[in-house]
Amino acid sequence: MLSAQLEAYLAEINLPATAEQKKQLLDFVGMLNKWNKAYNLTSVRDPEAMLVRHIMDSLVVSPHLQGERFIDVGTGPGLPGIPLAIMNPDKTFVLLDSLGKRIRFQKQVAFELGIHNISSIESRVEAYQPEQKFDGVLSRAFASIHDMLTWCHHLPAEHGQFYALKGQLSDEEMQQIPAGFVVTETIELKVPRLDEQRHLLKIIKE
């Protein structure tokens, strides 16, 4: 059942996937559902809802990624980083979170599903000092745009971008973007079977 739904959703957003990638996405949902019972990784309890609210909600960003090296800040159980890594084997993703149980889950997912282009790091974002900066800094349900930019300002490379995944955009939040940052693009995203607003903001440092 989930397999057919995934096929339909991927077709709806025009995102081609191999049989192996589809299997990895479905297996990720299965592991998230299983571990969630013990570790409370997400408030979404139903695998069908996970497919929409977590997998597809992450994958709609995929066509907009520019570069090869990304960090997913406040990734939780690996969202959007793990679905994006599955669909973009040519890119690398660092998954950053301050909670050990989430990092343990991510590492188990990478091991069991054979995902080789992610690395999980347990750290607060302010304390994390990467040896190499990133082409893209991703944030989904992590913080306000103001806080994301304030806490993550040290992470992008010289021509790197911030990718802020937001629901409804408020004028108030947009007005609180700190000085020195510019929104270069605001993209309305359409998630299959999700009747809620979704936006991607691309932001650069001036």
From Swiss-Prot:
Its main location: cytoplasm. It is found in: Cytoplasm. Disulfide bonds: none annotated. One of its GO terms (molecular function) is rRNA (guanine-N7-)-methyltransferase activity. Keywords: Cytoplasm, Methyltransferase, rRNA processing, S-adenosyl-L-methionine, Transferase. Belongs to the methyltransferase superfamily. RNA methyltransferase RsmG family. It comes from Shewanella sp. (strain MR-4). The gene is rsmG. This is Ribosomal RNA small subunit methyltransferase G. Specifically methylates the N7 position of guanine in position 527 of 16S rRNA. NCBIfam families: rsmG_gidB (TIGR00138). S-adenosyl-L-methionine binds at G74, L79, V125, E126, R140. It catalyses: guanosine(527) in 16S rRNA + S-adenosyl-L-methionine = N(7)-methylguanosine(527) in 16S rRNA + S-adenosyl-L-homocysteine. Its EC number is 2.1.1.170. The keyword Repeat does not apply. It is an enzyme of class 2 (transferase). Pfam families: GidB.
